[in-house]
């Protein structure tokens, strides 16, 4: 059976906006979770709240098939841990209790940090250099747990 409901966090960001457009073009029912109010758009069901609100997350993910986690704090250092790490942990915890078929976590190439290697792989040792990179790396470790 083909997936019908796709959820996107971080839909006001560059990757999230494009993800939403593509999912709508594919005929999916799209749900968007945003901290800030967004303008209503055809084909999108809006959920306002943050990644730490379990009640909203449960409603957001109810009967969903796909989740694209594009949200992340890139500017305000004091919010990075709560959004990028704690928010991801909360979202992932709720998602694991649903019937999602697909969970896509968007991270950052920056988690690798500085390297002299020409190519990086899954086995490359990560050495994040700043708070954003560190928090995105911590989030990667959370979602890679079984």
Model-derived regions: residue spans:
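Active-site Tyr-X1-5-Lys
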Residues: 129-146
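N-terminal Rossmann-fold cofactor-binding loop
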Residues: 33-38, 51
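N-terminal Rossmann NAD(P)H-binding glycine-rich loop of SDR-like oxidoreductase domains
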Residues: 4-26
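Conserved Rossmann-fold NAD(P)-dependent oxidoreductase catalytic core, especially the SDR/UDP-sugar
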Residues: 86-132
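Conserved NAD(P)H cofactor-binding loop of Rossmann-fold oxidoreductase domains
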Residues: 71-74, 107-109
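NAD(P)-cofactor binding segment of oxidoreductase domains
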Residues: 67, 75-104, 137, 142
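Rossmann-fold scaffold of SDR-type NAD(P)-dependent oxidoreductases
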Residues: 9, 64-70, 105
């Amino acid at each position: 059976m083909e997936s019908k409901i796709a959820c996107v966090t971080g839909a006001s960001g560059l990757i999230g906006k494009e993800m939403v457009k593509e999912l709508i073009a594919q005929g999916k029912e799209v749900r968007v979770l945003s901290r800030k109010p967004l303008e209503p758009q055809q084909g999108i069901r809006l959920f306002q709240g943050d990644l730490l609100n379990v009640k909203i997350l449960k409603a957001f993910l109810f009967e969903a098939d796909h989740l694209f986690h594009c949200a992340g704090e890139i500017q305000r250092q004091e919010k990075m841990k709560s959004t990028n790490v704690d928010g991801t942990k909360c979202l992932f915890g709720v998602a694991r209790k649903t019937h999602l078929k697909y969970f896509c976590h968007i991270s950052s190439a920056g988690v690798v940090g500085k390297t002299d290697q020409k190519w990086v792989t899954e086995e490359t040792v990560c050495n994040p250099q700043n708070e954003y990179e560190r928090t995105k790396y911590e989030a990667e470790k959370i979602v890679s747990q079984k």
